A protein has these predicted regions:
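Solvent-exposed, non-transmembrane regions of membrane-associated and secreted proteins
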Residues: 2-209
């Protein structure tokens, strides 16, 4: 009986710890997001049409003139905030999420904000990993096909995507996310840490204004 009580107490302590860590991560991300948005706004005097990238730059393939975005440096600009680099922010309206994205990843960074693990939005191979906090990517499994995702880089370029596939993967299946063939991949751990939830996205076709 004593053993059972100890296990229940341990589970309760773990639950409270996780909730505290989740709330703290949410607050930190909100503060950092404000800094990222401020850094982007500081160079917002550029013409809007030179800062938007809502369609895939395939001028030669579709017979049209190459777009201005084709000349972009494939490496995304990085801004330093509180000792860490950031490449922009990701927004998932269906989940009510808007989060800063760090330029590099490790487990310490994942406790703070989502991280760019591989690729670049300018090469259509961006992979963003995040902790399974509710305030980060813990609700990815709730997304539906067709949901919109946007990623805004530090130059203010807005990239708009559509969720095309949602999969549960093995932690060892790195190739599936790193070389998926999709323009954007979002992923996180399942609650038990045994698997990964990944959302594979492609760019949308920009609406004509």
């Amino acid at each position: 009986m004593a053993v059972g009580a100890a296990l229940i107490l341990s589970a309760l302590v773990l639950l409270l710890h996780n909730r505290y860590a989740d709330a703290r991560a949410g607050r930190e991300a909100e503060t950092l997001l404000a800094g990222v948005e401020a850094a982007i706004s500081s160079q917002a005097d550029e013409p809007e049409e030179t800062r938007r990238q809502e369609t895939r730059p395939t001028g030669e393939e579709n017979g049209t003139e190459p777009t201005a975005t084709e000349a972009l440096d494939p490496e995304m600009p990085v801004a330093m905030l509180e000792g860490y680099g950031y490449v922009g922010y990701v927004e998932i309206p269906a989940l009510g999420l808007k989060l800063p994205v760090m330029s590099d990843w490790d487990y310490t960074r994942l406790e703070i904000a989502p991280c760019r693990q591989f690729g670049s939005s300018r090469k259509d191979d961006l992979v963003i990993a995040a902790h399974n906090f509710e305030s980060h990517f813990g609700r990815l499994k709730e997304m539906s096909l067709g949901n919109t995702v946007t990623f805004t880089d530090m130059a203010g370029i807005v990239n708009t995507y559509r969720a095309e596939m949602i999969e549960t993967l093995s932690p060892k299946d790195v190739e599936a996310v790193q070389n998926s063939g999709y323009d954007l991949v979002l992923y996180t751990c399942t609650r038990d840490g045994q698997e990964r939830v990944a959302v594979f996205c492609n760019r949308t076709i920009a609406e004509k204004e």
